[in-house]
Amino acid sequence: MKLNRKSILLPSPLGEGSGVRLLWLLLALFALTAQAQVKSKVITTLKGYPSGTIDEYHFHAGNAVVMGRFTNRTEHKFSTFNVTGTDLFSNQDFVRTIHIESDGSFLELISLPHSGWVYFDGVEIPPAFIAVGDTLEIQVDGSVNEAKLSGSGVTGEVNSVWPRLESQFSSKETRTPWEGLDRKFMLEWKNRKVKELDQIASAIDSDTITLLNGCSHHAKDVLKTSLLAMPLEQMLVAMHQWWWRTRSEDGKANPALTISAASFFDFLSVRQSYLMDNPLMVFAADGGGVINNMEFIVLNAYLFLANDMQRWSKTTDSDELGNYKQNFILPHNYDPALHREILVFDKGHLVSVADYYAMCSDSIRSRFGLSNTGFMMQLCLLHRVLDFDFEGSDDWFLTRKAEELAGAIPQFTAPSICHHAVDVYRRFVIEREGNARMDASNSTPGDSLFQSLKEKYAGNVIYMDFWGIGCGPCRRGMLDQRTLVEQYKDAPVRFLYICNEKDSPREPSEKFLTDNDIQGEHIFLSSDEWNLLTSKFQFNAIPFTLLIDRNGNIVEKNVPPTAAKLDELLK
């Protein structure tokens, strides 16, 4: 290190002897070391955070009231709007439809998977925090296109303070870090974000955030967590974007632009108590973004089975034994003879599902320097286990999910994780086993609308694509499917492209469809009809797709159609 006396403000030495010079050199090194230590100090735990006032109840499902009024409505007087969100434990979207009276008022008791942030479809209302047991009140003035949020308990406190708090601590960065794919700028930007994070942590630790004065401890916990989540979510999104943008069309990375997740997120380990092992992240305003991107970018060993660990859903038919050479996980329905045959392919190395998940956890902790399998790791593993996006009722699927849940349980120590793991699986089994016994008399308006859409094309394989003109992935998917639509134009296969006419007006939508020769059936729904279907299928993002067999049964959700699958359904 080059020393600069002026930078450390030391006077000139009194003598020129070697002993004196050595003494001053040691003093200079001591001063610089002290400066570096002060500069690099990181707060590992935050005083008074969390406060311990948020009990387990708020991590569980419950009800809340949404009420309010629309005044001075000048646009189309829609009769419903949707409250949407994500169950951050099961990773499933939820949609609750709110009915508007003729005078513009609304009052609805809705169920929530846990306290957290919700969004609003079809109306200009900002995101809102809502706690189970509370009331969220919304007043919307159509003449100025303004919504005011209030409510009871912590719901009212958080929604009152958060807009001002977010503005106070929002980033001053104006350039997106992946702009121009400048690796040096990306890393410098990351360092500035870590500094922002540390400034927020310091303000929380020293209790100097004046906007929190007068708030309950519960509200303070939610608001402080939302502040911590802001820069963390921005860094996760930036790395996600960087990962995709620095790869070629065939998915290969550019070595000159590669940034490893382990080096980019090297700041997590010393801050893990409030970033990685913090259950309150599910209550943060950006909590969903943090958890979703954490799952894909940092903790993807669970999701993608990284580190050369591979696990596939295979049967144990003798003609498929060769496929196990890529798989060292014991199949759930093996017998001793089969076991011996598999060992030949895997050179004697087979482990249980529980051991496999333990290996994944060990790998993540080692890679990112984490001292324990904290809440965030447990949550992302739970998402892996609770991936139930399969519409069949095959016994093998139920058995495999039970095996995966049993294998993951040793990794779960957080009470809220354990609760949701068992509760979601219980509901999954009830729904699967109860499908055949569902009484048609219990059908909803959404069921009736869906049935009417299917009946028009009865006897056909139906691919339903819920899209919007402003959705890039939707448009790209439709363009990619043109060859497939043409290939099956004379077969009993129908492609239905369904949109909300309010969000996708006919003129620009039909122009896109015509200009790009998008064939198929094009259906424009009213906002109320769209809300019925989003509520029925519980989706709040598009594209959302359904593949339906010739008997009217849903066989796949959110899976792009393929010729192989269509041919299978046509047999």
Regions found by a protein language model. Give the residues of each.
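Short, internal strand/loop/helix patches
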Residues: 353-354, 510-550
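Non-catalytic, surface beta->alpha helical segment in thiol-disulfide oxidoreductase systems
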Residues: 540-544, 550-571
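Oxidative protein folding and maturation machinery
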Residues: 144-459
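A non-transmembrane, solvent-exposed segment enriched in polar/low-complexity residues
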Residues: 38-218
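Bacterial N-terminal signal peptides
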Residues: 23-31
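Short pre-active-site segment immediately N-terminal to redox-active cysteine/selenocysteine motifs
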Residues: 460-462, 466-470, 502, 541
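Glycine-biased, low-complexity coil/linker segments
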Residues: 15-17
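Conserved redox-active cysteine motifs that mediate thiol-disulfide chemistry
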Residues: 466-483, 500
